[in-house]
Amino acid sequence: MDFSDALRAIKRGKMLCRAGWNGRHLRIFMVDSTERPVKDGDAMAQRVPVGTMLGHNNHIGILAKDGTVTPWLASQQDLLADDWMIDDGGVEESFVRGSAA
């Protein structure tokens, strides 16, 4: 599928990957908006009182092999690719946090 179809699938809550990615365990998905308090020592604590709830907007995240999630931005190759796939939902051992080889 192309990126337009992939984006629609992400908005429906699907997890996706590309056949052309070198990291075969990488998946992208929608990270829902959340709120979290400013903590003492946070960079924001210099401008916002500790304990203030800050909103975090929806964004696309990428799930790495070690189980960590990072905000993701599409490259030009990702935007133009036709090899997007919806994750079949299978659980891979390699997705267990801390098991990266």
Segments (PLM) and residue ranges:
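A general structural signal for short secondary-structure junctions and capping/turn motifs
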Residues: 7-9, 52, 76-77
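Short, 15-30-residue, compositionally biased linear elements
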Residues: 1-5, 52-54, 64
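Short acidic, Pro/Gly- and aromatic-enriched capping/linker segments at domain boundaries
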Residues: 1-7, 70-73
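Catalytic phosphate/metal-binding cores of nucleic-acid and nucleotide-processing enzymes, i.e., regions
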Residues: 4-25, 29-48
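A short, compositionally biased
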Residues: 11-12, 54-58
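Short, compact, well-ordered microdomains
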Residues: 56-101
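Generic detector of short, locally flexible boundary/turn motifs and exposed helical patches
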Residues: 46-52, 94
